[in-house]
């Protein structure tokens, strides 16, 4: 059986925090800002943590990433 590889697409989008949680950036932030409210644009700037339901799958994609 070959070794598992780190999923490079996921590795570029997620960073591990000091406590081991995974931090991700928000979607919908590249264009079409004219029809988004100021509040929505401000909230999109903040990073979020990967949800508990997705954590197992994402950790499997990032098998060797520290």
UniProtKB/Swiss-Prot annotation:
UniProt xrefs under Pfam families: Ribosomal_L35p
Location of the region described as Disordered in the Swiss-Prot/TrEMBL record: 1-49
GO molecular function: structural constituent of ribosome
GO annotation, cellular component aspect: cytosolic large ribosomal subunit
Keywords carried by this UniProt record: Ribonucleoprotein, Ribosomal protein
GO process terms (BP): translation
InterPro entries reported for this sequence: Ribosomal_bL35, Ribosomal_bL35-like, Ribosomal_bL35_CS, Ribosomal_bL35_sf
Bias kind Basic residues: ranges: 1-16, 38-49
Record NCBIfam families: rpmI_bact
Family as reported in the entry's similarity comment: Belongs to the bacterial ribosomal protein bL35 family.
Identification of the protein by name: Large ribosomal subunit protein bL35
Record organism: Staphylococcus aureus (strain NCTC 8325 / PS 47)
């Amino acid at each position: 059986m070959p070794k598992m590889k780190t999923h490079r697409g996921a590795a570029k989008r997620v960073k591990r925090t000091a406590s081991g949680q995974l931090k991700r950036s928000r979607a919908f932030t590249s264009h079409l800002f004219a029809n988004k409210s100021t509040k929505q644009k401000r909230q999109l700037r903040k990073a979020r943590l990967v949800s508990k339901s997705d954590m197992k799958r994402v950790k499997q994609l990032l098998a060797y990433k520290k």
